[in-house]
């Protein structure tokens, strides 16, 4: 039995851009995540699926960024993010996404037209890939689940800032919300 119907499935690629890929990542390298995401996208697109590229972006004054007190809050450079931080790798840029969503928070659903874009395309299943497993990816998976989408998490097409962060999410949180699969299983749809 197939894992998904390509015609009603979208790959949602989270934050594959210099801002995140330039950091130390584990257990999978940024390049592994990019390569695996590209493999899933190529296979899904050839079968009639939808590709959604999600990047994070802010205005130069960060007026659209969440600015709540936190013990380990994010800090941004004055004057806006540099161009290199916003750039996506060539392997991802070459995929020609059907939709590009710019988000300002962890979840690709929060404050964006993600749900509208998925529903208008008849999408019922979403495949998640990207960085970081336990931040942007997990937040988007939680919201996809809450919006009643079937979710597949591409375990080796996502990563975090430590193996422990990635593993905790994949072992204890995501199995309650999604089917966890390797890239090879998703590409072969089995």
Specify the residue positions occupied by each region the protein language model found:
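Generic, well-ordered alpha-helical segments
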Residues: 29-36, 68, 80, 84
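Short acidic, Gly/Ser-rich segments with clustered Asp/Glu that frequently serve as metal-coordination loops
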Residues: 19-22
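Short beta-strand segments at enzyme active-site cores
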Residues: 13, 49-57, 61-62, 154
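Short, flexible, mixed-charge acidic loops at enzyme active sites
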Residues: 63-70
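A short alpha/beta connector and helix-capping loop motif
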Residues: 7-9, 26-56
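Short, solvent-exposed loop/turn segments at secondary-structure boundaries
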Residues: 24-28, 164-165
């Amino acid at each position: 039995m197939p894992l998904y119907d390509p015609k009603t499935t979208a790959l949602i690629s989270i934050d594959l851009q210099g801002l995140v890929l330039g950091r130390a990542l584990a257990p999978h390298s940024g390049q592994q995540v990019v390569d695996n995401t590209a493999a899933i996208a190529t296979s899904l697109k050839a079968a009639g699926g939808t590709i959604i590229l999600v990047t994070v972006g802010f205005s130069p004054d960060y007026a659209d960024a969440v600015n709540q007190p936190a013990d380990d809050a994010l800090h941004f450079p004055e004057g806006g993010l540099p161009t290199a931080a916003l750039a996506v790798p060539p392997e991802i840029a070459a995929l020609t996404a059907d939709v590009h969503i710019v988000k300002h928070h962890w979840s690709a659903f929060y404050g964006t037209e993600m749900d509208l874009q998925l529903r208008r395309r008849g999408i019922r299943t979403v495949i998640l890939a990207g960085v970081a497993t336990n931040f942007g990816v997990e937040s988007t998976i939680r919201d996809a689940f809450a919006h009643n989408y079937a979710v597949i998490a591409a375990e080796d097409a996502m990563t975090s800032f430590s193996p422990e962060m990635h593993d905790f999410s994949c072992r204890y949180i995501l199995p309650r919300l999604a089917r966890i699969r390797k890239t090879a299983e998703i590409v072969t749809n089995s």
